[in-house]
Amino acid sequence: MVKHYEVVEFDIKNKKVLSPRQSLTSDQEKALNSLPAIYVYRSSRTKQIYVGQTIHFKTRHNQHYDGNEEKFEEAKFDEVIVLFFERANGSSLDDIENQLITFFKADNPRNKPYKIINGTGGNEVTVYTDIEFIAYNVILPFWDDYLFTNGWAKDKQTKLRESALVKYSPLKTLTEDQSDLISRVVSDKKHNYVINGDAGTGKTVLLTHMVAELMKDKSKRICVIVQSNWEKTANEIFGIYGMKRNNLVVTTSTKFIKDAQQGEVFYDAVLIDESHRLFRDYRKGIASSWVGIYEGEFSQCKSHLEIIQKAVGSKGQIILMYDVLQSVRPSSITREMFADCTKDYKKEFLKTQFRIKTPVGKSYSSDDYINGIKYLLFKDTGLLESGYTQFDPNFNRDVFRDLSPDAYFGYFTDSPLTNAYQWIRTKGIYNPSDSNRVLAGYVEPWKMADGKDSSIKHWHEGDIHLRWNSSQEGWLNSTDADADEQIGSVYAVQGIGLMSRFSTN
């Protein structure tokens, strides 16, 4: 395989002297003094790593050790590698530096075994011409074939990409539309916003970037409200990327309200992820943690959102991530209540980032597939005309009529469970690195407690007997012996990015 990058290795002796591990060619000598490069320092003594970029490495190395950078003196680096690569320019340097910092931090959770001492995540990155070339010909092979092989990394990039620390990193590359949207919202402090986006449009990634942008002003107090099953992950994400400071609070809606009941809360900005899942005053089967929520000054409120709005008042900006098409529990805020609460908010829309591989000779696209699924599920609900989601009624129906072996969409009418299960097993044979799952709607009785007992089966068809997902959190990466024989419920995959889905009924 042709390599599109080269690595030059140095030991660092006498605190700062570069000692090449191989004889340098004249081209390498020239490159070290005049070409764009990425470099990574590492200390075997203090267990620290630093990632940087430059257009003249030797000059930059001397600058690091000129006595003005205390962290370099304390780190006691004893080696450095310099990466040269094709199509090097300002954009690709920013991209590689950004992604290496992200991957190193995900590879060293809680700064163990190595601490990444970069003060920031590098420069902001937007989509550029060579982004795919750099991703597949430089970043991926450099990480897997060099860093992983030579002990600089514990895990390969494919595994790290499944980590929430990478998926929702505030360092991920943004599209130009996403970057512009963040600028509009952050600069317009006089208005509250609803960021509308279907599943897979990058609402959570946008939220982490927006928090990073807001926190550039260290005088601002920021509150991020997330679902309870994501609170720990969100704290880890903001913590590992150096954003967990006294002016940032990550909490749940119920905890926020209880704090508000104890006294005045003041935030310059309150961002709420998955605001379609905020609770309403639904007393049936009310959780014990809700006791006292809809009382006192909040006794007339009908939802957690209404309480949050009242607590924040006009002092702070509220930014809501919303998907009108998602509604999981009867205790969630209704669409009508949400619309009423946000009637004076400005609305923004995210475009889908979903992509499909169109078979040769076919003309349908990912947009046709998404519009078709929306039409199938919501055509009689009025939601497609609500103004909260983007929908094209003139989508190409061929995506659902294609019967070729490589068709993107398919369904079974005979023995659907058996055929769906066999289908993912076959996919696994030809794609051994993939993790394939069968998902389903509420077709069979479901109890969370059943997940602890692998002998309890819920799905039966012929000789096949399968069970619902064993856990709610982290199910896609479950290590259960029968993980790929479990049927995933909506609760197991809610808010999780999926590469592909096959649901059976």
Describe each model-derived feature in a short phrase.
Residues 195:
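Hydrophobic anchor at the beta1->P-loop junction of P-loop NTPases
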Residues 1-55, 59, 91:
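GIY-YIG nuclease catalytic motif and its immediate N-terminal context
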Residues 206, 210:
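Hydrophobic positions on the alpha1 helix immediately C-terminal to the Walker A/P-loop
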Residues 26-28, 55-99:
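Conserved short loop/helix modules at catalytic or binding sites
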Residues 272-353:
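Signature of the SF2 helicase/ATPase Hel1-core->accessory helical subdomain module
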Residues 217-241, 251-260:
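AAA+/P-loop NTPase substrate/partner-engagement loops
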Residues 201, 239-253, 257-269, 343-505:
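Core RecA-like ATPase module of SF1/SF2 helicases and allied nucleic-acid translocases
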Residues 166-191:
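N-terminal pre-P-loop "Q-motif" helix
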